[in-house]
């Protein structure tokens, strides 16, 4: 019945357009007039990563004024949680962490990004999750104990220094893994357990990736995992993380669109089995382009949001708002993606006339 009514409405709108003088230059249109009868519904995004210590995304060189404006745009869109993707990567760190400076060959940072982000999260009544330090070497070389030791000391320092902020509400275990790095669960387990013990059981989150056709490894000749292999292997991995990880948010961009729903269903099934909330990590950049990386096409993002809704995801984070969805981004396409998102979900767009 709803489909019939939608079809009739679209027909009426099109007839209305046709009835007007096609040469009337004063005629204006709305995107709603051209929405298809079975346009996907999708689910909303409630969180974003903050990718300021970046792996492969260019920096926008923002100061606190620009970040303040962007937090406001996030809040206006409905985002209530921000996740620092990592405290540092290799030589670059997000704040002058004494525990890292004392043992690692890192550069002393000019800005305390952790304090800045926490103050902004406080201001806009958002939850902040602190992401761990990624050495970029120890865990890649198999020295898991060194990676664990660094992060346990960092957790103690960070909680003592920043734990008073009302927005400090969780931890992100930053090292990203797939089927090829199963031993990483040792880091997840030890670091996650310590973070929860120190902070009074604040939640922990992980965002691994699916070993699919769009991973660098598979595009270089490795074999993509099947859905059944993914379920078997991650059942084993997650069985070692029960009670340590609270939010499981698989990245959604490494598999093809026609495969994604089946993986999401498995992810939800596994999360439920081990008492975790199942989020999805909407990649708001486009892996299908020859350039790394540009904002995703709205149709692709909406398709992924609809699959996540149908699979019953408990929440959705994106990687990441500030570059790929923000009206403040250096990419003009990102602002248009923000416009389409607000328009689709009936959110007042305070940034339309930017």
Question: What positions do the PLM features span?
Answer:
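Acidic-and-aromatic substrate-binding clefts and catalytic sites of carbohydrate-active enzymes
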Residues: 53-67, 74, 86-93, 100-112, ...
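An active-site-proximal structural segment forming one wall of the substrate-binding cleft
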Residues: 108-124, 143-170, 194, 230-233, ...
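C-terminal motif of bacterial Sec signal peptides marking the signal peptidase cleavage site
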Residues: 15-16
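Aromatic-lined carbohydrate-recognition surfaces of secreted/lumenal glycan-active proteins
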Residues: 127-148, 170-176, 188-230, 247-253, ...
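Substrate-binding cleft of secreted/luminal carbohydrate-active enzymes
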Residues: 82, 249-257, 276-354
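Boundary/entry segment of secreted carbohydrate-active catalytic domains
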Residues: 26-88
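Active-site cleft segment of glycoside hydrolase catalytic domains centered on the general acid/base Glu
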Residues: 138-168, 173-201, 206-208, 257-266, ...
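Aromatic-lined substrate-binding rim segments of carbohydrate-active enzymes
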Residues: 64-136, 184-205, 264-267
């Amino acid at each position: 019945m709803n489909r019939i009514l939608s079809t009739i409405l679209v027909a009426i709108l099109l007839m209305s357009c046709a009835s007007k003088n096609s040469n009337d230059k004063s005629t204006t249109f709305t995107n709603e007039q051209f929405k298809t009868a079975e346009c996907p519904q999708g689910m909303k995004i409630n969180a974003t990563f903050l990718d300021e210590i970046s792996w492969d995304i260019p920096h926008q060189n923002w100061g606190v004024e620009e970040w303040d404006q962007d937090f406001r745009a996030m809040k206006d869109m409905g985002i209530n949680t921000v996740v620092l993707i990592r405290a540092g990567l290799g030589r670059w760190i997000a704040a002058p962490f004494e525990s890292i400076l004392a043992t690692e060959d890192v550069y002393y940072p000019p800005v305390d990004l952790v304090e800045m982000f926490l103050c902004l999260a406080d201001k806009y009544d958002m939850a902040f999750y602190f992401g761990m330090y990624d050495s970029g070497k120890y865990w890649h070389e198999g020295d898991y104990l060194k990676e664990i030791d660094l992060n346990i000391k960092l957790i103690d320092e960070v909680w003592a220094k920043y734990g008073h902020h009302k927005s400090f509400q969780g931890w992100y275990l930053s090292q990203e893994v797939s089927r090829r790095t199963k031993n990483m669960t040792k880091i997840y387990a030890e670091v996650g357990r310590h973070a929860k013990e120190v902070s009074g059981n604040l939640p922990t989150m992980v965002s691994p990736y699916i070993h699919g056709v769009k991973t660098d490894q598979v595009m270089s000749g490795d074999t993509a995992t099947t859905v059944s292999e993914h379920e078997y292997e991650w059942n084993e991995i997650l069985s070692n993380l029960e009670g340590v990880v609270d939010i499981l948010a698989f990245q959604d961009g490494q598999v093809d669109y026609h495969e994604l729903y089946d993986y999401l269903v498995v992810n939800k099934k596994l999360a439920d089995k081990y008492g975790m909330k199942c989020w999805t990590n909407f990649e708001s950049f486009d892996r299908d382009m020859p350039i790394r990386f540009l904002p995703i096409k709205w149709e692709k993002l909406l398709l992924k949001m609809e699959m996540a809704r149908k699979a019953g995801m408990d929440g959705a984070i994106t990687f990441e708002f500030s570059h790929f969805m923000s009206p403040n981004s250096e990419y003009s396409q990102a602002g248009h993606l923000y416009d389409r998102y607000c328009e689709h979900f009936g959110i007042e767009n305070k940034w339309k006339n930017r």
